[in-house]
Curated annotation (Swiss-Prot):
Name of the protein: TNF receptor-associated factor 6
Entry GO terms, CC: CD40 receptor complex; cell cortex; cytoplasm; cytoplasmic side of plasma membrane; cytosol; glutamatergic synapse; lipid droplet; nucleus
Subcellular location: Cytoplasm; Cytoplasm, Cell cortex; Nucleus; Lipid droplet
Single Gene Ontology MF annotation: ubiquitin-protein transferase activity
GO annotation terms (biological process): antigen processing and presentation of exogenous peptide antigen via MHC class II; antiviral innate immune response; autophagosome assembly; bone resorption; canonical NF-kappaB signal transduction; CD40 signaling pathway; cytoplasmic pattern recognition receptor signaling pathway; DNA damage response
Gene (name only): TRAF6
Provenance organism: Sus scrofa
Catalytic reaction(s) noted: S-ubiquitinyl-[E2 ubiquitin-conjugating enzyme]-L-cysteine + [acceptor protein]-L-lysine = [E2 ubiquitin-conjugating enzyme]-L-cysteine + N(6)-ubiquitinyl-[acceptor protein]-L-lysine
Residue ranges covered by zinc fingers (TRAF-type): 151-203, 204-260
Amino acid sequence: MSLLHCENSCGSSQSESDCCAAMAASSCGAAAKDDGVSGTASTGNLSSSFMEEIQGYDVEFDPPLESKYECPICLMALREAVQTPCGHRFCKACIIKSIRDAGHKCPVDNEILLENQLFPDNFAKREILSLTVKCPNVGCLHKMELRHLEDHQAHCEFALMNCPQCQRPFQKCQLNIHILKECPRRQVSCVNCAVSMAFEDKEIHDQNCPLANVICEYCNTVLIREQMPNHYDLDCPTAPVPCTFSTFGCHEKMQRNHLARHLQENTQSHMRMMAQALQGLSLAVAPVPQRDMLPYDSSPLSRISSGCCSDQNFQETIQQLEGRLVRQDHQIRELTAKMETQSMYVSELKRTIRSLEDKVAEIEAQQCNGIYIWKIGNFGMHLKSQEEEKPVVIHSPGFYTGKPGYKLCMRLHLQLPTAQRCANYISLFVHTMQGEYDSHLPWPFQGTIRLTILDQSEAPIRQNHEEIMDAKPELLAFQRPTIPRNPKGFGYVTFMHLDALRQRTFIKDDTLLVRCEVSTRFDMGSLRREGFQPRSTDSGT
């Protein structure tokens, strides 16, 4: 019966694809060869790799798979479909494993079933391979016939591949970005020494790189790391050093630039220490017999240590040392005078630099033309101080409304949680300042001021928080200042609540942006034309 089915299968496979024909012919040949032997012998001749074949197709069909194409054993689409004499269809690997494990019977109706009674169902195979399936890779929307699924998966951009460096799985479309920018094992180079390393090792390397710039902990000089030991030992003016006479008993430590002054102020005490040390040395050394003496050395210290110098030689040695100390004292005085001259020169240079910096800041302030954006960095630190009920008051640099124009600045105050009626609010005020053009401007100041906390999100439409206020000439806040900054300010005690500050991206990279736009009485109509109406303000001190 089995042979008859195989011959029919072989005969019908001539019109199918070469693959189906080859499989049918192979199956028929195996059946014909096994026809003359028992079922047990047939089972023993099959390769053990048969048992390792996978089960049915575990993919999503569109439309869903019909039940007639499901394997009763694995409940998936038939793979290499075979049919039994009793008319049931199974995956080839599933039914062979069932026969070998559970016995020679059909799993559906328990009819006697041998392996050599199975024959390929090429019709079912062709029908199943023609069904439409969805790509199983997450994110891929492609659909194809089942026979093309394997080729598609080999090129699918959403297929998972292991990173060759860290072995983590990623989709093909994301793998290049991961390898180039995200992988902890990607190769990077040190900007200082050009050594290549894995990114995850870069932090440790940066802490030990011999060519990295480091700051001296004593004088704040910037040097490369490999130069720092010599800098500490020889050059650093503020590094702590012991006194030159420490071996003679002076235990003072001081900054290197104070050493000369210390030697100058303590010359006499250092001489006493040396004399006491030399006297103790001469008393401690016993006379040495002539036959045990070392070769003669004419240096003062060698004569003392040899134990053979006379009292006269000892006095001469002390006189020589005192003369050397006097010469060193003169040298120290000269070096001290030079150092004081250099210190005065450096102080003058610092004053000049500060003056130039002030002039540059003044010129930059004049370029604002009434629009100034104040960048407040480390804002998280200010918020933490506010939560700890520490006062937070920050003033912006000065800026001009034009050239010529009024000079103003902003003041931001984070109200404490315990403040009455304004707890946890941002207070924002404007102060007038003494400027270069005050004598040419009309006083008191008159105009309109728009204060804005900028939304730093990437949204196309940003929701800034802003208020507009009109100057009130009768208030002291708008009179001509008599000191560098008018202590009276004008603005809002309750400009914005801190809870509202956290609802959108007002803080980005730990920075808050506050914008101030000022229109004097000559151009204040521009703000009103935009449709903004000022609300009542609170003057502050």
